[in-house]
């Protein structure tokens, strides 16, 4: 009989007043007993609606049933038959909008905690198993993957399992893409990403770092080197700004730069060549998951006051509820229904305040959310010494500008056939944020998986 508890088994977490001063992982993971108890809540539905909500097609009821039986390694094998990065997706996937959003248990009560169970299985395997993935027999065909982020790594893993000789070209000095530069340690430990990459290398995937495709090598040169197909998963790392006065002041960062300096470069250390500013009061403009990450990092780096400035209200926030909840627990101050007008500097060109105007919500706009309308005469100054802009990113134009025949849309995103993920160049495929603009890790993984299947079909005919 299923466990008919209406609520999930709670996830153990660090105390908010402790964790907001360190970069250790907030969520501490299920014990074996917790995992089995939570897994027993699954009804093993005949129609399996949860699977339809998973972009990488994990056979969810099957692996959950194995967890309930205490057969954790078997559960892991089921997960990794379709998901190359379970320890990552189990931590950062917005399950509430994907598999858990379709869980029947969520109709009356809380859905089964599929993400926590996936994470548990991956962590259990890392801790208890010395077994390495076995490299399949090569089929002799070479495929290049541009970008070692979630879409590129997923595509590489799926192709390697089919016997392709896969080389991943990564612009940074370490593999992981947004997983290492964008997502903080307290949400996704870098050791986890490193281990998942090593698992792919065991399958035969070669990773070459410090390789900026479009500068060091072009897409055409990759074809000349013998690669039969190319997947572009170069992400969307070009930050957007509001275009308001004062964005050139010292102390204004894009969230992309702030998080990269913090997560990847550890620029908060005193001996770093270009240290990040030691802030006392920080305003983060925007309210997506990236904004939450930036705000929570600023708090951990010693800022006394950290504000999230957003022109709409709590109900319109696109960030995951869990991330908003954690941010509020950690003392982040939400300044909703406020919009920046300009950033004010002192005589040394450093940020001293941000001028904002109060907003009110009108009728819904094209996004379906109520349109924010400025309240005339309500301007005020928010005293801050650092401003972090987190209002979106777009793909870097380097690859498209050096690759003839590669079409993009008006946002600079690569145009692909949505069924095959093939671009307007034969043999060139793309997925993830390079195609969609900034989106979720799991959607990028799904695109990488879809592209791998299409590349396999393409090369099987050629």
What are these regions (language model features)?
Residues 52, 56-135, 201, 209, ...:
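Glycine/serine-rich phosphate-binding loop and adjoining beta1-alpha1 elements at the start
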Residues 84, 149-150, 174, 288-290, ...:
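Residue-level detector of alpha-helix initiation sites
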Residues 120-137, 195-215, 239-301, 409-419, ...:
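Glycine-rich dinucleotide-binding loop and its adjacent helix/turn
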Residues 137, 142-146, 194-244, 342-351, ...:
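Feature captures the FAD/FMN-dependent oxidoreductase FAD-binding
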Residues 141-167, 291-299:
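N-terminal Rossmann-like FAD-binding beta1-loop-alpha1 element of flavoenzymes
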Residues 165-168, 172-203, 207, 295-342:
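Rossmann-like dinucleotide-binding cores of NAD(P)H-dependent redox enzymes
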Residues 248-278, 364-438:
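FAD-site-proximal beta/loop scaffold in flavoenzymes
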Residues 434-461:
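A conserved FAD-binding loop/helix module that cradles the flavin
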């Amino acid at each position: 009989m299923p466990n008919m508890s209406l609520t999930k088994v709670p996830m153990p977490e660090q105390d908010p007043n402790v964790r907001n001063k360190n970069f250790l992982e907030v969520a501490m993971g299920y014990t074996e007993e917790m995992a089995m108890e939570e897994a027993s809540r699954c009804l093993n539905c005949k129609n399996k609606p949860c699977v339809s909500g998973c972009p990488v097609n994990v056979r969810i009821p099957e692996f959950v049933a194995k967890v309930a039986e205490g057969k954790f390694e078997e559960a892991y094998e089921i997960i990794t038959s379709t998901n190359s990065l379970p320890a990552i997706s189990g931590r950062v996937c917005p399950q509430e909008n994907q598999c858990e959003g379709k869980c029947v248990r969520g109709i009356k009560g809380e859905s089964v905690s599929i993400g926590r169970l996936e994470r548990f299985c991956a962590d259990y395997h890392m801790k208890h198993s010395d077994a390495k993935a076995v490299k399949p027999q090569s089929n002799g065909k070479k495929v290049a993957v541009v970008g070692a982020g979630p879409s590129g790594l997923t595509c590489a893993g799926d192709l390697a399992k089919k016997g392709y000789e896969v080389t991943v070209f990564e612009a940074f000095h370490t593999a992981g893409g947004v997983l290492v530069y964008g997502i903080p340690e307290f949400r996704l430990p870098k050791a986890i990403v490193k281990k998942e990459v090593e698992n792919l290398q065991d399958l035969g995937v070669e990773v070459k770092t410090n390789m900026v495709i479009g500068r060091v090598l072009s897409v055409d040169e990759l074809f000349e080197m013998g690669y039969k197909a190319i997947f572009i998963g170069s992400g969307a790392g070009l930050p957007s700004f509001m275009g308001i006065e004062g964005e050139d002041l010292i102390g204004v960062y894009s969230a992309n730069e702030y998080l990269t300096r913090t997560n990847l470069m550890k620029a908060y250390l005193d001996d770093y060549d270009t240290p990040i500013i030691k802030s006392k009061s920080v305003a983060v403009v925007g309210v997506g998951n990236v904004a939450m990450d930036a705000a929570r990092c600023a708090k951990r780096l010693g800022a006394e006051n950290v504000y999230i400035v957003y022109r709409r209200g709590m109900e319109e926030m696109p960030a995951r509820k869990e991330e908003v909840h954690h941010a509020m627990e950690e003392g982040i101050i939400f300044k909703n229904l406020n919009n920046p007008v300009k950033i004010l500097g002192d005589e040394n060109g450093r940020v001293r305040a941000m001028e904002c105007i109060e907003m009110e919500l009108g009728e819904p706009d094209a996004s379906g959310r109520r349109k924010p309308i400025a309240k005339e005469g309500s301007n005020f100054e928010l005293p801050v010494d650092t401003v972090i802009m987190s209002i979106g990113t777009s793909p870097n134009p380097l690859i498209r500008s050096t690759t003839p025949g590669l079409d993009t849309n008006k946002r600079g995103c690569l145009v692909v056939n949505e069924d095959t993920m093939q671009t307007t160049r034969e043999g060139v495929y793309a997925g993830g944020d390079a195609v969609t603009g900034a989106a979720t890790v799991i959607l990028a993984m799904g695109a990488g998986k879809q592209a791998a299947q299409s590349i396999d079909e393409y090369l099987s005919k050629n």
